[in-house]
Amino acid sequence: MFNLMKKDKDKDGGRKEKKEKKEKKERMSAAELRSLEEMSMRRGFFNLNRSSKRESKTRLEISNPIPIKVASGSDLHLTDIDSDSNRGSIILDSGHLSTASSSDDLKGEEGSFRGSVLQRAAKFGSLAKQNSQMIVKRFSFSQRSRDESASETSTPSEHSAAPSPQVEVRTLEGQLMQHSGLGIPRPGPRSRVPELVTKRFPADLRLPALVPPPPPALRELELQRRPTGDFGFSLRRTTMLDRAPEGQAYRRVVHFAEPGAGTKDLALGLVPGDRLVEINGQNVENKSRDEIVEMIRQSGDSVRLKVQPIPELSELSRSWLRTGEGHRREPTDAKTEEQIAAEEAWYETEKVWLVHRDGFSLASQLKSEELSLPEGKVRVKLDHDGAILDVDEDDVEKANAPSCDRLEDLASLVYLNESSVLHTLRQRYGASLLHTYAGPSLLVLSPRGAPAVYSEKVMHMFKGCRREDMAPHIYAVAQTAYRAMLMSRQDQSIVLLGSSGSGKTTSSQHLVQYLATIAGTSGNKVFSVEKWQALATLLEAFGNSPTIMNGSATRFSQILSLDFDQAGQVASASVQTMLLEKLRVARRPASEATFNVFYYLLACGDSTLRTELHLNHLAENNVFGIVPLSKPEEKQRAAQQFSKLQTAMKVLAISPEEQKACWLILASIYHLGAAGATKAVFSCGRKQFARHEWAQKAAYLLGCSLEELSSAIFKHQLKGGTLQRSTSFRQGPEESGLGEGTGTKLSALECLEGMASGLYSELFTLLISLVNRALKSSQHSLCSMMIVDTPGFQNPEWGGSARGASFEELCHNYAQDRLQKLFHERTFLQELERYKEDNIELAFDDLEPVTDDSVAAVDQASHQSLVRSLAHADEARGLLWLLEEEALVPGATEDTLLDRLFSYYGPQEGDKKGQSPLLRSSKPRHFLLGHSHGTNWVEYNVTGWLNYTKQNPATQNAPRLLQDSQNSVVECLPSKRKALGSVLSSEKKKRKKKKKKKCPESANSVAHTYSLSTQTLQVDALIDTIKRSKMHFVHCFLPVAEGWPGEPRSASSRRVSSSSELDLPPGDPCEAGLLQLDVSLLRAQLRGSRLLDAIRMYRQGYPDHMVFSEFRRRFDVLAPHLTKKHGRNYIMVDEKRAVEELLESLDLEKSSCCMGLSRVFFRAGTLARLEEQRDEETSRHLTLFQAACRGYLARQHFKKRKIQDLAIRCVQKNIKKNKGVKDWPWWKLFTTVRPLIQVQLSEEQIRNKDEEIQQLRNKLEKVEKERNELRLNSDRLETRISELTSELTDERNTGESASQLLDAETAERLRTEKEMKELQTQYDALKKQMEAMDMEVMEARLIRAAEINGEVDDDDAGGEWRLKYERAVREVDFTKKRLQQELEDKMEVEQQNRRQLERRLGDLQADSDESQRALQQLKKKCQRLTAELQDTKLHLEGQQVRNHELEKKQRRFDSELSQAHEETQREKLQREKLQREKDMLLAEAFSLKQQMEEKDLDIAGFTQKVVSLEAELQDISSQESKDEASLAKVKKQLRDLEAKVKDQEEELDEQAGSIQMLEQAKLRLEMEMERMRQTHSKEMESRDEEVEEARQSCQKKLRQMEVQLEEEYEDKQKALREKRELESKLSTLSDQVNQRDFESEKRLRKDLKRTKALLADAQIMLDHLKNNAPSKREIAQLKNQLEESEFTCAAAVKARKAMEVEMEDLHLQIDDIAKAKTALEEQLSRLQREKNEIQNRLEEDQEDMNELMKKHKAAVAQASRDMAQMNDLQAQLEESNKEKQELQEKLQALQSQVEFLEQSMVDKSLVSRQEAKIRELETRLEFEKTQVKRLESMASRLKENMEKLTEERDQRAAAENREKEQNKRLQRQLRDTKEEMSELARKEAEASRKKHELEMDLESLEAANQSLQADLKLAFKRIGDLQAAIEDEMESDENEDLINSLQDMVTKYQKRKNKLEGDSDVDSELEDRVDGVKSWLSKNKGPSKAPSDDGSLKSSSPTSHWKSLAPDLSDDEHDPVDSISRPRFSHNYLSDSDTEAKLTETNA
């Protein structure tokens, strides 16, 4: 043990010496190093390879080219950079020169292309031909002459001079072996990186030609000039990259005619991206903008434009112009015969892709004859040159038709394979179509230039659209996520994946800009487009820097969260950052620059600011490498960017003081770099600044003294140099000291770098806090949208650099791997788990398992790592954890780190090729890690990685330095950051407590101490944040790697490039290679992302799913019969059955949906079609509802206008009445009393209204109170939920950590028990050995005592004992030899057996490998065949769906055709009947017309006679002095006229009778027609039943159509009944008119005209029906179409049968394949069993061998111990013989005493040590037991708490579910109520319409009645006048005749009155007048009259006349107050026009 301790001390001393030598070399100057190198070169054993962390500083630049000579006779081979180490090459890398002689010739074409798959994947086309030029292009030599340029291509000879000391030389290990005789172990060759495609073929293989897309069609538009004077469109000019027919790229100026700012619709017909071609027929492509504007201005009222979309926007324009709104796409047109023939010819030729190393080529697979080709081979013929090749089946892939070249969705490809996808992407990229759907994801190819597909006008083309309606675009992803967020109210996240430089940051900026533009912000404008642009500018300046792969690469990960309110507007926003490369400020790879903000600041044009920052004079050297730009244009651009940055800060509300503080910190970092750091020579190596004047400037800017700054940087470096990490949980208590030997010292430069990185980290954290302050808001947010942008995959080899990747690049690659893993989990694992939960069986045989070996190699933790022990456990751990463990081990280096890493994850013996995620590199301290499932191999350089675990005290001192600053501006920054952090944390405490805990605003604010475990924690927080939302993935692919092939852009040209600048600068290298695409690189990215598997799963699976209840609620509108059957609120016990009924009614294809246990699943696109049908149905219902609403509103408006008109008329009449009665006494009394009554009524009403208002107010207050209480309860519950969630998270984390600690303690306890058992075993062995030694010692003592006694007694006895002893020794020797011989014989036999077993094992291993290779080939073939079979199945399902749709259309067409036939037949029969009726009615009408004409003539004559008679009567009445003869003549004429009138009345009665007879005949004919119609309907019903029996599939549809027909028939019958009622009313009125006197004949004529009009209308209808009736030719055409459709249907049925036969064949093939597969699996299982048996036997043999070896070793050890014992005994025996004579008595006592004492002392020491160890182990065991018990109790308490929280969460979830269900029921009741209200409104509208028609009829009748009454009034007035005139002439008996005639007229009137119905006021008035006439007649009928009576007669006649005319006047005059109270006067005169007329006459 002491020896082991001594060896450990020696080893530690050796390590310490090496360490001191290394530090001594680091302290050496450059001159000393050069001299040491020259000395070592002279001695021949130089092997200098310093790889310090400041390697870039020790390397020197090449100032002049090195003259290299070529030896005569030697050949020079300049090959690619990716050649192996055994080939001659020249590698120049950042000042390094590596030379290697070509040892082997390059043999074969295959050997010339051996290299890294990454370099080959980054190439486009063939390999670079001019390698020397490529090598030279990677450097910018400061001086280059024309003479020296020729020397760059030479190589040094073997005997050339030593290299120049200005150049650091790295020689290969082979040359080192030659130069030195030392046995330096040469590292093993670099492992081969697995390649994607390696095969080449002996033919000219070319990629398919890029077929240019057909140019978009030109559109001609004619725009009218608007009232504002313009045409409503804007003119925009720009430059575009285009390709000439010869293939050259050039720029041209184009003009766009786009909709104006105020035009948001398609009224103009223009869309964004329309290129202006012609104006008014003149081409304007080559005209200037002024000329075009002048041409538009000179146009008249209209202008004709011809426009054409640009290729980038052709898809968007097509999809937008298909409909008026662009929200729905039209179905594609049917294919023509030519297209179908072309596709058939394509598929018959069996086109395939031949996959080779450079890409793929199009070929035709030839049908080989039997046995002409070996198995697994096919024969193909290349299309471009006709070469015929025999290739493997795995080298060909199915090709799609040319129509699939530019599909928008890769999931629509018929054959889904890598080559087809690459071909589609290549063709789309060549057509400037950068976006492509890949199932649910989006694939974006980063453009080399700036495409014109991103603008605000293009954004509005996506607003409000569904995903199915949008062309692939980054805006489509944003719209899809935004729409999903609004519909589901769930958080959404958009994750961008891809390599560095692939356009992720640009795409994320477009996403945020779209959301900010379309969603808008609330009233406070907390987040606008201007603020987002300012934020992007700020992040780009402080977080981006140029790299070898990207001109402005993002160097941090960020999550931009947009919070939305209830209205879908942005309420607030926040930015979270992590994984910032803060060390890039001071240290970064060669040829890369620092953050952009430093170059912007150094180019600042503000002299005042430069003076304040001391930047007027810049330093020549800067240890941080921060140098100003040299080119004037770069300086100008950087100055512009600085001004833009200042403007952005103002927009983000960053005050000038805060801006100034930022500039002060940045300038101080620059001055620190200029100051530098060194060790003072005369101050015992004290660290200090190299240039104190620059350090003084930095101290002044930071507000501290130079001593304080120096102390913060240099004087406390040992504080963190002890590997002390507060955030790491591996630190033991014994490692916390600050001793010199427990940690490594930090150099002065490292301390300075730590301060710079700390300052920049604090500044960046402060800026994020200020940004969040500007974006915060107090509004309540409902859900959020997160955009995740992380740095892409970093691979320096893709950028043309030979350096190894750094640790920061490893972190970024690790984050990308984690995001890729998240994509795989979301796409594959979650979907499969969902299918498994719902019991849906889907076979994904070709789906490879998801592997995350690269992730595990970085972050895999172990339980042993939690134990505070330095002992290495056998459990594998990741690189980050190994770094921390190795940092704790004294003397650990990067080499030991790599050894441990490769022992866990490196390739092991027996592993298959390509399974290991790690490979060794030929360079020292380098390794390769395979990212993206082994498709992206990155070489990492681990030099200096152990320093990342050291805690830099300067970094920790940076915040304290800012806090203690004397500058007030700088001092307030930390306090502001703390205040902002507290405000933000309080604002987001409710919803984002967990996120804030794990993912703060900036990762640097977690802790200022650095630990590698924080990298994993930050990425975990990022993943956890994303997992809580619904994810949308965008895959950004890199089309061509930056700098390969060709020259990479210099870092200086990219330092000031802004990501926001989209215009391509002139001279960009991408112009020469417009839209180039590297197929190999794209294949690597495509295979690494596993997009093909995702698309295949998307196609084969059921990506869309919906819960049963939600599906029924959403789509029951498509099945109204189910709604009528069950009602809208129906609740069924079996939801699944209800959904099945709904699916059956929807008539979906069976393969398009699948029923699960709780939800229904749909194929891709099925749910979208259902949504489209639902939208159409909803639109139809809404249209009808809107029409009903508008009709109702119009009717209400019309009714209101009628009421207003009536009110106006009433008011006017009342005013007139008021003028007449205002002076009457009763009216004055009325006007005095009426207001008093109204006042009382109004007071009562006001009191009632006040009470009602008070009640409503109380109710409102109560509702508001309840609402506030509910809101408070809701907020309290939300707060409680968030607190419980956070507590649950904390408890869960605590439980996880406790379980980890418990597991760790358990493992440690087991390990301790194991060690204790081993020690116990050793103790027992030692104890046995000690007992055996004791026995031997005792025997020796006894023998010695016996010998001594024997010598005393007898000398002969000693000889006897000696002989016995010698004999025993000989026997022992013989026994040992015999045992040794037997052991050797057994060993030989065992070795022979082992060799046989090894040979057998080798044979079996070879057989197993061969079987594995065959199995892998069969698996690949099976997977390929399965994929092709799945593609065929999907294609077949698509065809079946299409056939199903065609069958549905055919059935619908058949039903419509049969219905048309029935309608035609019915119309024909009705036409014939109506024609017969028409003829009869025409004849009757003609006869009636003739009769009416005759009567009209007679009436006209009579009218003339009446007029003449009236004239004569007038003359007679005016001439009172006429004689009796003329009076007699008049009387005679009067009697004649009366007779004629009687005759006319009789004739009119006869005509009325004839008209009545005609009406009866017409009614009879109508009844006959009705009976015939009923008979015909019965016949048709029988025919319908026959048709239903013949067409069972159409029975449901026909019943619906019959129901509609019956409803129409009932409506028609109802109309006919109404018509008959009107006709009966008309006949009744005609009878009434015929019974009137001759004055009412006009009414008869009107009725006759109306009858004629009705007949004319009937004639017109008959003519219309006759003209519209289909002809026989049309019926024949319909029959032909029917026959053609039946023939088509039969053909479709045949095709379907043929497809079914093919399906059966395919099923048979599948069965054969399955059988073969099962046979192979059985064979494989049999081989596996044999292998297992052999392996078991080998293990048993190995165990036996081990036992034998153990026995052999034990025997050898025992023999050696026996020999040693025998030698000791022999020596003791000799010694005792010599001393026997001298000290016999004294020797025995002393010897026994000494030996006893020595033995007893040794035993006590051993026992004491063992007992101490046992006590120590028992103590540790008791402590571990107590710890275990404590942790178990803690775990039990945590479990109880978790169970309680789970129960509370379940209860709350149940309550929420109940509330949701109640809400759903209320919503359904509300919908039902709305539907009932709409039904009532419809019924009310129908009733109002009928009422309106009746009112119109009533008004017409009343008007006719009024006209008749007016005629009667006029007649009676004339009679009165005639009576008054005749009274003076009645002196003879002739008066009696006149009186008799008047009496007869009165009698006739009385008769006619009795016949009339109704008793109006006018009739009573007429009756009064008739009574007056009767009284007059009675007075004048006396037998004798005296002459004295004449005067009385004359005097009394007028009085009686006026009394008869105005009988009511006297009453009114007698009692005016009573007349006021009459309803007739007080009320009816306002509503009844007749009464008003009567009152007018009465008042008059």
Curated annotation (Swiss-Prot):
What's the name of its gene? Myo18a
- Compositional bias per record (Basic residues), positions renumbered to this chain: 988-998
Q: Name one GO biological process term.
A: regulation of macrophage activation
Report the residue ranges that make up the IQ domain in this protein: 1178-1207
Every copy of the Myosin motor domain together lies at 405-1175
Question: Which InterPro entries did the record assign?
Answer: IQ_motif_EF-hand-BS, Kinesin_motor_dom_sf, Myosin_head_motor_dom-like, Myosin_N, Myosin_tail, MYSc_Myo18, P-loop_NTPase, PDZ
Gene3D superfamilies from the xrefs? 1.10.10.820, 1.20.5.340, 1.20.58.530, 2.30.42.10, 3.30.70.1590, Kinesin motor domain, Myosin VI head, motor domain, U50 subdomain, Myosin, subunit A
Coiled coil region boundaries:
1239-1959
Of which family is this protein a member?
Belongs to the TRAFAC class myosin-kinesin ATPase superfamily. Myosin family.
Enumerate the UniProt keywords alphabetically.
Actin-binding, ATP-binding, Coiled coil, Cytoplasm, Cytoskeleton, Golgi apparatus, Motor protein, Myosin, Nucleotide-binding, Phosphoprotein
The entry's protein name is: Unconventional myosin-XVIIIa
